[in-house]
Amino acid sequence: MARILITSAIPYINGIKHLGNLVGSQLPADLYARYARARGHEVMFICATDEHGTPAELAAAKAGKPVAEYCAEMHAVQSDIAKRFGLSFDHFGRSSSERNKALTQYFAGKLAENGLIEEVSEKQVYSHADGRFLPDRYIEGTCPNCGYDKARGDQCENCTKQLDPTDLIDPRSAISGSTDLEVRETKHLYLRQSALKDQLDAWIDSKTDWPILTTSIAKKWLHDGDGLQDRGITRDLDWGVPVKKGTEDWPGMEGKVFYVWFDAPIEYIAGTAEWADANGLDDAAWERWWRTDKGADEVRYVQFMGKDNVPFHTLSFPATIMGSGDPWKLVDYIKSFNYLTYDGGQFSTSQGRGVFMDQALEILPADYWRWWLLSHAPENSDSEFTWENFQASVNKDLADVLGNFASRVTKFCRSKYGEEVPAGGAYGPAEEALIAELTTKLRAYEGHMDAMEVRKAAAELRAIWVAGNEYLQAAAPWSVFKTDPDAAAAIIRLGLNLVRFYAVLSQPFIPDASAALLRAMKAEDAGWPGDVAEALAALPAGHAFAVPEVTFAKISDADREAWAEKFSGTRD
């Protein structure tokens, strides 16, 4: 049994997330966490809301609420939606927690102690129209590198190049759109990432198993242009972690807060400490996951995120960890994702474009969405959500293949033998061939899941479902029953065991449907199959079952058209 630490990029507090956010981090992280638990590993799965920075301040102002109150309410909303989507976090924390505040200040103090913090007088953009300094991400303009006209002052989302606001061509306030901007002098703390460049470069080179998407972005930031730059880690804002050197005041930094991208990744650690607190455990309980001098050297740490978060997780956060000089656990594997697009354009939280998590659940249960999103995960390139594709995938994969199989087998058994596994007959060459085929496919499925190859795993799982359907069609128990009820009983006995087998294997993808099938099979305690032949004999003759409710309903053309129309504009 291994110990696996899993973190998902933490979502901003400023509103309910769309399906593109979900498939880029939380959902594949949940898939892996559920699979790892099913295989018997000890798992710690941490996520949180990212509550600091200008987005939180602006969203609270728009809602007419104090920012702390707004964040508390939105955390509750996001937590509830996550539960309804079946996201199995061990803890869903808050970056505004006291734990994160203390840890962020602690790391800053250690970095300063080690000569890796520099005080810099710099010029920062002030917006007269907004009456405030503008954080980097709230200045928009044209990227000097690729010409994208909605580049932000910290990074171009189009080419991923790291930017400063003064690099932008024709800059404007992202808040008001005003171009009445003035550059003023202010003092900030910088993390001397450049001093750790060689160490970071060597560390990334050692990660030969990382996805190309992850390493290529990290290398670009390390070597393009002037190479890795020092990074400002403080801001002139009211809301955030107050700047302190450990527990001491930091002269000249009064009234400033740490940059959201400095404190947000530290919340992975703080969130684990919050988990310990919530469960009445001492610090040793969370330190064994994070301190290599206290047991974390045995932990495999995996992070999930969208590609726009890669630079901060491959460079800035590791620089914080390395620079502290303390024995903290560094990430072992970063699984990054491209973007999910929506009917030819971008999903957008700020513009309200696309389908959002709460809206999705108003239409259909979570498993419909989980299956489509994971089986179309944007791993090697961007993926596009279309209502036609969604309908086809749900109807063919979930309704026609998996749901139809469970329905046919259980209903036929009930009509001919009653609601218990029938006795009689024995497995023959066809059944042995199916067991051999499923053994090969199960090992392939496990291999893809171990490697976090999400789309390949989904395709293999579907192939496992299809194999059972093809067997049932060829074996034709409805015909065999007329002349040899015992032989038909053996076919149906295998079929009922296949329903149980499928439910166990499908649980990481579609947990609610899997749980319903296992309840119907009265096999809630079913564990991951080691041997396929044993798994397909797990329900013996005489074992009671119930015919399950419709596992997945088909999506009609009328529904598809209505939803496409409903979500063709932007959210209010």
From Swiss-Prot:
**What detail does the entry give on cofactor binding?**
Binds 1 zinc ion per subunit.
Q: What residues does ATP bind to?
A: T349
Q: Required cofactors, per record?
A: Zn(2+)
Q: Which segment of this protein is annotated as the motif 'HIGH' region?
A: 11-21
Recorded catalytic activity of this chain's protein: tRNA(Met) + L-methionine + ATP = L-methionyl-tRNA(Met) + AMP + diphosphate
Q: Could you read off the lineage of the organism from its UniProt record?
A: Bacteria, Pseudomonadati, Pseudomonadota, Alphaproteobacteria, Rhodobacterales
E.C. number(s) listed in UniProt: 6.1.1.10
Q: Where is this motif: 'KMSKS' region?
A: 346-350
Q: Give GO cellular component annotations, separated by semicolons.
A: aminoacyl-tRNA synthetase multienzyme complex; cytosol
Q: Which CDD domains match?
A: Anticodon_Ia_Met, MetRS_core
Q: Which SUPFAM superfamilies does this entry report, sorted A to Z?
A: Anticodon-binding domain of a subclass of class I aminoacyl-tRNA synthetases, Methionyl-tRNA synthetase (MetRS), Zn-domain, Nucleotidylyl transferase
Q: Please give the name of this protein.
A: Methionine--tRNA ligase
Q: Which of UniProt's keywords are assigned here?
A: Aminoacyl-tRNA synthetase, ATP-binding, Cytoplasm, Ligase, Metal-binding, Nucleotide-binding, Protein biosynthesis, Zinc
Instruction: Please describe what this protein does.
Output: Is required not only for elongation of protein synthesis but also for the initiation of all mRNA translation through initiator tRNA(fMet) aminoacylation.
